[in-house]
Amino acid sequence: MKSINRALVAAALLWAGGAIAEDQDAGSGLLPRALAHIDDYVTADIAKGVVPGATITIVRHGKVAYRRAWGERDPTNRAPMTDDAIFRIYSMSKPITTVAAMMLVEEGRLGLQEPVAKYIPQFANVKVGVERNGDNGQRVLDLVDPRQPMTIQDLMRHTSGITYGFFGDSLVRKVYTDSHITRGDFDNAEFADRIAKLPLAYQPGTTWDYSHSTDVLGRVIEVVSAKSLYAFEKERILDPLGMRDTSFYVKDQSKWPRIAEPLVNDRAIGRDAEFGDPRVPRRWESGGGGMVSTAADYARFLQMLLSSGTLDEHHYLSPKSIAAMTSNQIGPAAGVVPGPFYLPGPGFGFGLGFAVRLEPGVAPQLGSVGEYFWSGAGGTTFWVDPKEDLFVVFMMQSPAQRLRYRIALHNMVYGALKN
């Protein structure tokens, strides 16, 4: 009940009508003079032309401790950054999709242990790519059967064996790159069919490897719910939370001026990939990286998670589901090893849709054991700290600076804690 009351206070004070007061709350336990270091850090980068602009919202004990918008929303027309700016959140779509899938798990319509092929039959024939040296010394890719089926849990924790094509130079990744699976206009059903024809990079359930797994999970949601991914998420998550500006594309032209843009020399989000235009709708609703949102919208989502799955007396998820999602699901006990491109970083494990901090040290940033986070390729990031009853959502469109900011923001926010 205490967490629900905090959530109600948060909703009333912070997000009614989309307005959030910018002044720090005196009871937040965060020192204003220390939080000012964030101002200095961001404004210095803006002055140097390193980032165009950014927004941040820090909430503690259900109240805004700090909120700012700096710089320019669109550097091409010098439009100032605003609180309601719309950002491409890329992989911050993944937690929303995973929450949607967990709703189906709670209803008994989906099981973590179930094979993906139960819902997408094409995955019954998937193969695993294994490299070896050929007679001429060249690398050769052999295809072998999986030792165990790919499961729904594997999709949620990135242990499916599916991969992305932009990390490393393995032969499987080359197959992904050469197949151009994201080219053209297609829906989630066709995407799942395309990716099921490609070899897996690892045996399912053995290795954490960042991937299109959440995109496939989005298709599973469609099959189980008999609705499009967006229709299901809109009905069950976005509309009840009041996330009016969160979607896969911005179809409403009146919102187009609010879309945040990167600097012209900072548009690359990966190998041979640049910022997409959310004004141009496609049939693909990428549950792994296709959404746009605002800081205020995403704050509603995070407050729901921090409030144990209930916000404004509306129940979304059980506290037990959130506990499972934010507990480590990899490591020796699970028989899962981190792959060579382990994005959660040192000191972190991975749950279902979230990286989870396991150690007070090891990681290069300050924080709490049990905090969970994820980020987007375009420069957005968030984390939730249940121990400190705190969450942070930071949004910018600057992929080149995203890792530096993720670490620096942690250090400055926790450096401001006084109790």
Regions found by a protein language model. Name each.
Residues 26-89, 109-111, 125-134, 274-276, ...:
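Short, conserved catalytic-motif segment at the N-terminal edge
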Residues 74, 121-367:
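Short, surface-exposed loop or secondary-structure junction motifs
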Residues 1-8:
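Bacterial N-terminal signal peptides that target proteins for export
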Residues 382-384, 389-398:
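Short, well-ordered beta-strand elements
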Residues 16-18:
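N-terminal signal peptide c-region/cleavage motif recognized by signal peptidases
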